Curated annotation (Swiss-Prot):
Function per UniProt: O-acyltransferase; part of the gene cluster that mediates the biosynthesis of calidodehydroaustin, a fungal meroterpenoid. The first step of the pathway is the synthesis of 3,5-dimethylorsellinic acid by the polyketide synthase ausA. 3,5-dimethylorsellinic acid is then prenylated by the polyprenyl transferase ausN. Further epoxidation by the FAD-dependent monooxygenase ausM and cyclization by the probable terpene cyclase ausL lead to the formation of protoaustinoid A.
Pathway assignment: Secondary metabolite biosynthesis; terpenoid biosynthesis
UniProt gene name: ausQ
Lineage: Eukaryota, Fungi, Dikarya, Ascomycota, Pezizomycotina
Entry's transmembrane regions: none
Enzyme Commission number(s): 2.3.1.-
Protein name: O-acyltransferase ausQ
Superkingdom to which the source organism belongs: Eukaryota
Length: 502
């Protein structure tokens, strides 16, 4: 292991610090043939990773200018080991083969917290690790779980670590060299343009709640439950095509309201995000009104939803793709739960409908359109969004407060067939995000396929966390039930349409 003095302490950016110290987890499953060789490969790869990026072995402490990453102290007897190996003799891989398809999906229960190297919430007033690893040995393989401190990494930054680790396992001689991920840029994070940009607002007083004042803060939070939902790629493509077929009408409606430029396409990610947010909003409304007779509850509700947006390319100059720090801020949009009577639509609308009732279809199409409009203008508006996020009321970021109806982030652009870990580990069977702890969290998981030839028909796996009452209603929403894999059959595997998935 490299010496702890191999890097200079640095202060985390205001955007890093705004996310707070909470750990999230990536869990990668492998069906290994030689357990000893696999363990040796992982340990060697982690050592090499620390040699190239020694700050990963650091710890986070409070300093004059805020949170700081420094070399670890040597006298911390209770310090969580950097790498742990645990055997679970009564467990098997959390992997399920999806019917006759070539795809694996996460088994429909959350990974046990025992698989995680440390707790999600760190001990207050103590130095906190930057990253920790745990190798979980089960009867038919192993699960490598990586715990990332959100004050140091966002989801994409953590994915850089996974890519570097894969390269360290597969081809250690080339890690960090030309043609591979450049680690040097991540080590100079303190000089990044993002630090200079966000530091402009560092001295602004963030609103602090000295004591909880609203019922939402003081009430006991409802029990949370989470499941991995498997969406049929064929159904989502049909829904996307249907939404795109009515873009002319949606563009005309938007021009009447705001004079916005035309939207040229809606991606599968837009449409899936819209479907998830629409169905969660409907489920929350239904959970609050146990009587499903909408005639007794004619009032509509407006729900705010959030979607994480990567600002690496918006910053001037742009941040490198391998920037590991936080560079994501929320894009906000609203959903109204009111459903009008079935509109009398032209035949073109009726023919475009993929199978949902017309009101649900139009609501999803309009929300997907709103998302695309906001994404198109995000380059001009992200500064305001960033300023707002950095100066948000801290009481609204507490883990027990419902910050939004739904919070969607997507890792779909990460493709497991591009993450080759070498012969000892083999291909990734599933790529999970562990257990989210926020009510309304929706994580679109990485594209899990063994080759690009079948990527186009790979299911969309989404880990969703909701309170129990809302989850019950959510699982009974017709639009959700229609879109899930069990309700459809994939077509012949095909190549991935990158523009469609963007």
């Amino acid at each position: 292991m490299p010496s702890s003095s191999d890097f200079e302490a640095f202060t985390l950016t205001p955007l890093d610090q705004a996310n707070g110290q909470v750990f999230f987890f990536y869990s990668l499953s492998y069906r290994v043939q030689d357990e000893a060789s696999a363990l040796h490969t992982i340990h060697k790869a982690i050592d090499l990773l620390l040699e190239k990026a020694p700050f990963l072995n650091g710890e986070i402490v409070f300093a004059t200018d805020g949170l700081e990453v420094r070399p670890p102290t040597t006298d911390s007897e209770d310090r969580v080991p950097l790498v742990q190996v645990k055997r679970h003799s009564n467990r098997t891989l959390p992997v399920e083969k999806l019917g006759q398809s070539p795809f694996n999906v996460p088994r429909n229960f959350p990974l046990d917290a025992l698989f995680n190297p440390l707790a999600a919430l760190p001990t207050p007033d103590r130095p906190t690790p930057v990253i920790r690893f745990q190798v979980n040995l089960v009867n038919d393989g192993l699960v490598l779980t990586i715990g990332f401190n959100h004050a140091v990494f966002d989801a994409l930054g953590a994915a850089v670590i996974v890519k570097l680790l894969a390269e360290s396992c597969r081809n250690p001689a080339n890690v960090g060299r030309e043609g591979s991920l450049e680690i040097a840029s991540t080590q100079s994070r303190v000089r990044s343009p993002l630090l200079a940009l966000t530091s402009r607002w560092k001295k602004l007083d963030r609103v602090r709640a000295d004591a909880p004042s609203s019922p939402e803060v003081t009430a006991v939070p409802p029990p949370l439950t989470d499941e991995c939902f498997v969406f049929c790629a064929d159904k989502l493509q049909r829904l996307r095509a249907a939404c795109n077929s009515i873009l002319c009408q949606l563009n005309e409606n938007q021009k009447l309201l705001a004079g916005q430029p035309d939207v040229r396409f809606l991606s599968t990610n837009d449409v899936l995000t819209a479907l998830i947010c629409e169905t969660i909003a409907q489920a929350r409304h239904a959970a609050r009104h146990t009587c499903r007779d909408e005639g007794l509850h004619p009032e509509s509700t407006v729900s705010e939803c959030l979607m994480a947006v990567n600002i690496r390319k918006f910053v001037d100059p742009p941040l490198p793709d391998d920037y590991m720090g936080n560079a994501g801020i929320p894009l906000r949009f609203q959903i109204e739960t009111r459903r009008d009577a079935e509109p009398d639509l032209p035949r073109a609308f009726q023919e475009a409908n993929p199978g949902l009732n017309t009101s649900s279809f139009l609501a999803i199409a309009e929300t997907a359109y709103t998302i695309r409009i906001k994404l198109a203008s995000f380059g001009d508006s992200y500064i305001d969004s960033l300023r707002s996020f950095l100066n948000a009321d801290e009481s609204q970021t507490a883990v027990h407060v419902l910050p939004a109806c739904a919070i969607v982030s997507s890792l779909r652009h990460i493709k497991t067939y591009e993450l080759q870990f070498g012969a000892e580990l083999g291909e990734i069977r599933t790529f999970e995000t562990g257990i989210p702890w926020v009510n309304g969290s929706c994580v679109i998981l990485p594209l899990c396929a063994n080759s690009s030839e079948v990527a186009g028909s790979a299911p969309w796996n989404v880990r969703i966390t909701l309170d129990e009452g809302t989850m019950y209603c959510f699982k009974n929403e017709p639009a959700l039930r229609w879109a899930l894999w069990e309700q459809g059959r994939s077509k012949v595997p095909g190549s991935c349409d990158c523009k469609a998935d963007a």
